[in-house]
């Protein structure tokens, strides 16, 4: 690179940095007019803040710098870049120098240590019960037990996983307890970790690195992605990401296999079933599949395009046959409400990048994550457009679709902009950055021949690294009594999760409603119906989600039609964003106050009874 070009590049990078800060400054001035025609109430509606503001700001903040970066590399290094026709060429499949045979000792060692680590885990605490998030799962399950209905009995926030996970747990362990569900969630995290390693194996196939270097790449990336998930802490990867991992494990193989029939079947089926299980992840995956179909069409890969269309249709038919048209109709009504209203009901403002650091609680994290998103976009553009021998076309295209997923999945952070959701939305772009850094370091080591590496030394380095990272997490003394500890947790009576005051209230509610088949929960203490072992009378067990004119009408109709006798009107346990359900559902609240009277008011709990 000559001096003139180097100076130009430095100049353009400085402009790029300036654009990023300019976009950050302009962030707060991008504001759409507020309107709330559907009457949904949440933290954003209280301050008359348009829920789409942060999405538009995000598109501007990421889009403008990336457009400028693309412009300046074409301006300064056009001869080193590919043209558009390049992306529609026939795939050049790289000779596979990294089969499972190459890595099986490392893979088996990783899985072995993960299993040992799992056996050494502390059993779930028999004391803490999250009234909202645990209730999201336990109450839909109890609704199903009594009504034998899925979405017709439960309006869930995430999808079918809210219903199915406890049911599977109780079937697996043969007991209907909170502990069984909590242990099952730990098993799901273990599966998540194993799937993460499998995904990294396929990612490590990419590039022109020799096998001995790919072994190191696989090891380092595996350790990094394993650190993304935790059994007990809120972390980057969670059980919701199981479906994305399964999808990408099959999707990535579509880019280096000639016959893709079975892969097309799997990615189509996984997408549809993920929508059923976890709405937002399923929609993001469908956008990826839709983008892929468009690419197949333009690149004249008609066989794959037709297969995916057919398999999607086939998967939808299977879903209808499993659940029936009535259940699916209820489910799609829920999807519609969630898509158009969840940000209004549950949304929080995204902190202004840079300017919120040190001022807002999550300002620093929000800035870091959105900058990571931008950096991963710059890495993608460089990977896609430069005539590099490191990656083949098919490998570049996978990174493109993977980044699209990262880009749209960031919507979770833009919708609910608290620390937890921001962190959850930073996992995949972080992986792109780590892959690029490690790949670059390994390439420089190889180029400068710093280490005389061979296969045996690669294995040795990998074993040492894995041992150094994972072994300190293993509490070997816990392995001996693993069975007793976990059985104690699985079969622990639910009463152990309640304080004495809570037990008294639950007993009051049980006594008062002893002759009723159900209770209607109007609070955000969602676990109450499960604790009294009665289903919710309407499908709106999570009442705070049913905010908006049309859905409140349906709520009132269900109260009338089912002649609901008892309503738990208030609880001191939890309020989402400190907004009472009565303030969110004004029409339902008005109906309740007109038609119900107070029968119990104790320790912050209020139970209402239908007037005679």
Where are these regions (language model features)?
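Signature aromatic-anchored transmembrane alpha helix within multi-pass, membrane-resident enzymes
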Residues: 212-214, 309-317, 441-478
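Hydrophobic/aromatic-rich transmembrane helices and adjacent perimembrane loops
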Residues: 55-60, 243-246, 283-284, 408, ...
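Short periplasmic/luminal acceptor-recognition loop of GT-C membrane glycosyltransferases, typified by
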Residues: 156-157, 493-546, 555-577, 605-608
């Amino acid at each position: 690179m000559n001096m003139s070009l180097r100076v130009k590049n430095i100049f353009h990078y400085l402009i790029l940095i300036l654009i990023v800060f300019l976009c950050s400054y302009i962030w707060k001035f991008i504001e759409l007019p507020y309107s709330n025609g559907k009457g949904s109430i949440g933290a954003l509606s209280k301050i008359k803040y348009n829920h789409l503001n942060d999405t538009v700001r995000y598109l501007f903040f990421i889009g403008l710098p990336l457009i400028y970066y693309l412009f300046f590399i074409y301006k300064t290094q056009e001869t080193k870049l590919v043209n558009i026709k390049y992306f529609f060429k026939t795939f050049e499949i790289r000779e596979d120098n990294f089969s499972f045979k190459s890595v099986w000792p490392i893979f088996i060692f990783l899985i072995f240590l993960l299993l040992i680590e799992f056996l050494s885990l502390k059993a779930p605490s028999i004391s803490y019960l999250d009234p909202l998030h645990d209730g999201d799962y336990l109450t839909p399950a109890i609704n199903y037990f009594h009504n034998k209905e899925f979405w017709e009995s439960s309006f869930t926030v995430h999808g079918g996983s809210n219903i199915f996970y406890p049911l599977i747990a109780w079937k697996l362990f043969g007991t209907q307890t909170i502990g069984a569900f909590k242990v099952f969630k730990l098993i799901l995290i273990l599966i998540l970790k194993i799937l993460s390693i499998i995904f990294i194996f396929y990612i490590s196939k990419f590039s022109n690195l020799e096998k001995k270097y790919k072994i190191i790449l696989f090891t380092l990336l595996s350790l990094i992605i394993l650190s993304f998930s935790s059994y007990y802490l809120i972390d980057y990867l969670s059980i919701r990401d199981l479906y994305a991992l399964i999808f990408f494990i099959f999707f990535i193989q579509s880019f280096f296999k000639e016959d893709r029939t079975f892969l097309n079947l799997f990615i189509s089926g996984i997408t549809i079933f993920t929508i059923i299980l976890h709405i937002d992840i399923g929609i993001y995956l469908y956008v990826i599949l839709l983008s892929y179909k468009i690419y197949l069409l333009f690149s004249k890969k008609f066989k794959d395009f037709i297969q995916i269309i057919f398999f999607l249709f086939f998967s939808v038919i299977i879903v209808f046959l499993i659940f029936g048209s009535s259940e699916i109709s209820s489910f799609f009504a829920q999807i519609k409400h969630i898509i158009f209203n969840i940000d209004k009901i549950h949304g929080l403002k995204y902190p202004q990048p840079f300017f919120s650091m040190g001022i807002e609680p999550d300002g620093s994290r929000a800035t870091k994550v959105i900058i990571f998103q931008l950096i991963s976009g710059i890495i993608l553009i460089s990977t896609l457009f430069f005539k590099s021998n490191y990656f083949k076309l098919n490998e570049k295209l996978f990174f493109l679709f993977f980044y699209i997923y990262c880009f749209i999945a960031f919507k979770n952070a833009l919708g609910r902009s608290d620390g937890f959701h921001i962190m959850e939305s930073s996992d995949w772009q972080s992986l792109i950055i780590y892959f690029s850094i490690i790949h670059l370091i390994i390439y420089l080591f190889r180029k400068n021949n710093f280490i005389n590496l061979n296969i045996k030394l690669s294995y040795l380095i990998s074993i040492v690294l894995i041992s150094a990272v994972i072994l300190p997490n293993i509490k070997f003394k816990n392995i001996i009594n693993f069975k007793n500890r976990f059985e104690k947790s699985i079969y622990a009576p639910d009463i152990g999760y309640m304080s004495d005051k809570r037990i008294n209230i639950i007993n009051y509610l049980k006594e008062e409603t002893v002759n009723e088949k159900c209770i209607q929960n109007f609070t955000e203490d969602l676990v109450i119906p499960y604790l009294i072992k009665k289903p919710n009378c309407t499908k709106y067990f999570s009442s705070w989600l049913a905010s908006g004119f049309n859905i409140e009408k349906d709520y009132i109709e269900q109260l009338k039609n089912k002649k609901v006798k008892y309503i738990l009107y208030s609880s001191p346990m939890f309020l989402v964003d400190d907004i009472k359900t009565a303030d969110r559902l004004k029409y339902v609240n008005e109906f309740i106050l007109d038609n119900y009277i107070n029968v119990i008011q104790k320790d912050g709990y209020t139970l209402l009874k239908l007037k005679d």
